UniProtKB/Swiss-Prot annotation:
The protein, known as: Small ribosomal subunit protein uS3
GO MF term set: mRNA binding; rRNA binding; structural constituent of ribosome
Any Pfam family hit: KH_2
Domain of life: Bacteria
InterPro entries for the chain: KH_dom, KH_dom-like_a/b, KH_dom_type_2, KH_sf_prok-type, Ribosomal_S3_C_sf, Ribosomal_uS3_bac-typ, Ribosomal_uS3_C, Ribosomal_uS3_CS
GO cellular component, one term: cytosolic small ribosomal subunit
Length: 250
């Protein structure tokens, strides 16, 4: 059987680059690596409601710059910036140094693979039928400009005794084409029957030139700086689309 390699790792240095961007001596490398892992785990847990997609960590000259890509930046910033100030202080304690925080809003969370996977996982935890959740996410992504999307769910689907895997695909998802801009996301739904894994691949187009920073440039054009109000709630557009579909069928 053919196995699916992680498309992000396969394209590192071609049209993707690392999310941790720093160099260190041999005796400092392990310490900084564990700091990065701790910072990412803490942020994902603490900012779960903000819809965090990516966390980029840079370390220029004994400082730490953390860039958070989120669908709802208002949750991170808080009222008059109170929450982000507290978050900055907590991260400074973890990294033992000065921390600069940048918050970037994701304007189209329906086409972000990580946010789509987390959205489906949350719906499965609320006992929404997995096929309905998958089809709704696929329709939203295609409507907002994705050239292809594939979603896998695996586990005890619907409470079945035997675990299995089901997947849906719409459009093109060329996993073997290295110049293809493939966004990949993974999430886990913790249900009463056990854990259900959700994987999402979204094809955004092709990057013809050799540019490891291609993803960052695309996100810069799609996203905007975070404001006090935060982003749109995920799930709003799919619900409106479902209502229109039901009206058309009636």
């Amino acid at each position: 059987m053919g196995q699916k390699v992680n498309p992000v790792g396969l394209r590192l240095g071609i049209n993707r680059t690392w999310d941790s961007r720093w160099f260190a001596d041999g005796n400092q490398y392990g310490k900084l690596l564990h700091q990065d892992l701790a910072v990412r785990a803490a942020l994902k847990k603490r900012l779960y409601q903000a819809g965090v997609s990516r966390i980029i960590i840079e370390r220029p000259h004994k400082k730490c710059r953390v860039t958070i890509y989120a669908a709802r930046p208002g949750v991170i910033i808080g009222k008059k910036g109170a929450d982000i100030d507290k978050l900055r202080k907590d991260l400074s304690i973890m990294t033992e140094g000065e921390v600069h925080l940048n918050i970037v809003e994701i304007r189209k969370p329906e086409t972000d693979a990580q946010l789509v996977a987390e959205s489906i996982a949350q719906q499965l935890e609320r006992r929404i039928a997995f096929r309905r959740a998958m089809k709704r996410s696929i329709q939203s992504a295609v409507r907002l400009g994705a050239k292809g999307i594939r979603i896998n769910v695996s586990g005890r689907l619907g409470g079945a005794e035997i675990a299995r895997m089901e997947w849906y695909r719409e459009g093109r998802v060329p996993l073997h084409t290295l110049r293809a801009d493939i966004d990949f996301g993974f999430a886990e739904a913790k249900t009463t029957y056990g854990i259900i894994g959700v994987k999402t691949w979204i094809f955004k187009g092709e990057v013809l030139e050799h540019d490891p920073m291609a993803l960052d440039k695309r996100l810069a054009t799609e996203s905007g700086p975070a404001g006090e109000g935060g982003g749109r709630e995920r799930g709003d557009r799919p619900d409106r689309g479902d209502r229109r579909d039901r009206r058309d069928r009636a």
